[in-house]
Amino acid sequence: IKLIHTYKENQFQEGVLEDYAYLSKASMRLFQATGDESYFDFSKNITDNALKLFADDQSDLLRYSNNNELFTKVISLDDGVIPSPNSIIAEQLFNIGHIIFDDEYLNLSDKMVSSVQDIIDGNINSYSVWANNILNRVEPFFEIAVIGPNAKSITDDITNYFTPNTIVVQSKIESIIPLFIDRYFEDETYIYVCQNKTCQRPETKIDLALEQIPYIN
């Protein structure tokens, strides 16, 4: 997948890192909201392509553009008027790694966050998304997977709760996504609270499931 930033009168400009980062995050949010795995696949593909196109050979971060003009080698870091595309990609890698149980994505995200740690410490107000990335590492992080025929309605109800340091995902069908494998039952919908590739006892009620996350109660 290759994105086009602008197109006018048969002239086009190739997409920059912001285009890939924001589209990847938007697609991930659609996956979380609908359970449609095509959105997850698209989000992952966009993120993978961003890593290939914008890799910087002198750091663990990503460049603004993949052409060789000097100004495009700039690496955007601050979460100012809009979040840094690097902070968004770090967040995406973290979420993808937790959904597919892939340490490579998690390690790439860790390297990106570690490389800006000193900058963030001195001016956290300008690095809010980076700070959230750090928070996901300082406190335990959980996956909340809602799986079964009523996954959509239960997931919608869970969004009414404050659930920091979690990612909430859903599936109403049997799936090969690692977080969902062998957890689908056609006659019941279960809520799984998982951490470090292991899920706790599945629950059918939201309050009982969230009790498994210590800082929510």
Report residues per predicted region.
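Glycan-recognition and catalytic cores of secretory/periplasmic carbohydrate-active enzymes
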Residues: 1-217
